[in-house]
Swiss-Prot record:
Sequence repeat feature ranges: 5-20, 43-58, 71-86
Name of protein: Cuticle protein 1
Organism this protein belongs to: Blaberus craniifer (Death's head cockroach)
Disulphides: 14-20, 52-58, 80-86
Residues recorded with modification Pyrrolidone carboxylic acid: 1
UniProt KW keywords: Cuticle, Disulfide bond, Pyrrolidone carboxylic acid, Repeat
One Pfam family recorded for the sequence: CPCFC
Single Gene Ontology MF annotation: structural constituent of cuticle
Length: 87
């Protein structure tokens, strides 16, 4: 029976697979993706993560984000988030 059903499908919810009630499966299935765990960076004593987000390169200036480069000079991204359709 394990080879008949795809991974994540409860056989009790769909006894005649592949003819299933999609609303019932969506209601009772867990579709939340697993969040991978990433260990936090180990900052040495005296170095604040807020002051140096790209440690150990604290002296280097972080490049501008992609959304900042797309706006022309004088247009702030927070003032007009859907540029060029500003109101």
């Amino acid at each position: 029976q394990a080879d008949k059903y795809p991974a994540g499908l409860n056989p009790a919810l769909c006894p005649n697979y592949p003819n299933c009630d999609n609303a019932l499966i969506a209601l009772y299935s867990n579709v939340a993706p697993a969040i991978p765990y990433a260990a936090a960076y180990n900052y040495p004593a005296g170095v604040s993560p807020a002051a140096c987000p790209n440690y150990p390169f604290c002296g280097a200036i972080a490049p501008l984000g992609y959304h900042v480069r797309e706006y022309p000079a004088g247009v702030h991204p927070a003032a007009c988030p859907n540029y060029p359709y500003c109101v």
